[in-house]
From Swiss-Prot:
Cellular localisation: Secreted; Host cytoplasm; Host nucleus
Underlying gene: RXLR-C19
Gene Ontology, cellular component aspect: extracellular region; host cell cytoplasm; host cell nucleus
Function in brief: Secreted effector that suppresses pattern-triggered immunity (PTI) in plant host.
Organism: Plasmopara halstedii
Residue window of motif RxLR-dEER: 49-64
Domain notes: The RxLR-dEER motif acts to carry the protein into the host cell cytoplasm through binding to cell surface phosphatidylinositol-3-phosphate.
Protein name per the record: Secreted RxLR effector protein RXLR-C19
Amino acid sequence: MRSCQYLLLLFLASDTSNDAISEPTRKSQLQKIESKRGSVTQWEIHGSRLLRSSGGKIKANEERMETEMSKLGALFSRGIKAMKLVHSTSFKTLLHLKNNVFANIMETEGALHALMLGFHPLEVKSRLEHDHDIAVQLKLSLTHWERNPETKNLLSLLEKQNEWMKSIQPPASLSAGIKFWEEGLQKLDSLSCLNAEKILEETISQLSQEGLSGEALVEKNLSPFVYGTALYYMGKEQAKVLSGEEFSAWYNNQLKRFANFVNAYRDKLNLPPRYAKLHLFADFEVHDGVAT
């Protein structure tokens, strides 16, 4: 009898110990199952990590953009100060400044903004083709170009320009520049302009009038592309006849007027600072294939 009681107590004790040992194991197994099913706690932890990660990236991008824009502003200031110190007719200094500003605009604002500011399409295209870093940064922008019908037409125009640009030497003087520009436009089927010389001469005449502000030039339907072309040839001619100080003063006035023109042009067309629609040849109205 006593042996039976002893065996019964031994059996109950062993069963209780098994329960005590297996309980943590069962809890561990349940936790593993819940985590595999995607419990709320696991998703909350993952979501908070993702939020911290993306928030840091957004803040870093904003800080980088502010830094780049401050660099661009500093570059303009340094360029103006450098031009004031020029004591000889150095048009190369102007071109050097223009190229530096162009590179910064391409990097910070993109190709569309550079075109809207009056930089020649071939300059933009060449920069995209030969500068690997900018090409990588603007990869998304270029993809947008190819998908957008309006900008796709612009890319087609650049290809046509590139074809005849290879066979024509750059202009060496104002008269050669006018002929060069006119011949180029005539070779474009979509822009068969017959009076490019007249338009360019009228533009230079308007820019020569110091009383006309940038806003007044916008009211005369002057586009950034034609403005930039005329200003380029004006600068070359002025550099031949003006002293260093006179040329610096002339250039600073032109820079201020061009800045006013760009702001007024943007306001007139209701263009945002970025991703603006382009009207490079806004001065031309085509009627029956003839530009007027």
